[in-house]
């Protein structure tokens, strides 16, 4: 810790501190100085660790770019298989978000008459269910028939 400071220098600093601060304030000053030194060491170590981590990440990115530039031809079969599985998983995740060039629904109805009957049946089913929803919403259905009839 004190590489450049010898025993005589430490003794001189202690005596000067005792003379300047006195015996009452010297222990408090020593504690505060040691806490500052510890905080500085912790901060320096955390910065050092962060820099080392960033350098490792940069090295990994550089290694990946080198492997990619080589065409991944030197990889083992198991590693190539896992890369293919990862690519397929990425494609399956991206697939629902891709915009597909499909013909519009009107084009399907023109070329496929079966879909027209399905859509007509669906609209007739929704039309028959509409009066039921009106009677549920509030008024008595018998009063509607008297007013209509």
From Swiss-Prot:
Cellular compartment(s): Cell inner membrane
Entries under InterPro entries matching the protein: TatA/B/E, TatB
GO molecular function: protein transmembrane transporter activity
Keyword Disulfide bond among record annotations: no
Ranges of biased composition (kind: Polar residues): 86-113
GO cellular component, one term: TAT protein transport complex
NCBIfam families, per database record: tatB (TIGR01410)
Subunit structure: The Tat system comprises two distinct complexes: a TatABC complex, containing multiple copies of TatA, TatB and TatC subunits, and a separate TatA complex, containing only TatA subunits. Substrates initially bind to the TatABC complex, which probably triggers association of the separate TatA complex to form the active translocon.
Protein name, per record: Sec-independent protein translocase protein TatB
Organism of provenance: Shewanella oneidensis (strain ATCC 700550 / JCM 31522 / CIP 106686 / LMG 19005 / NCIMB 14063 / MR-1)
Gene: tatB
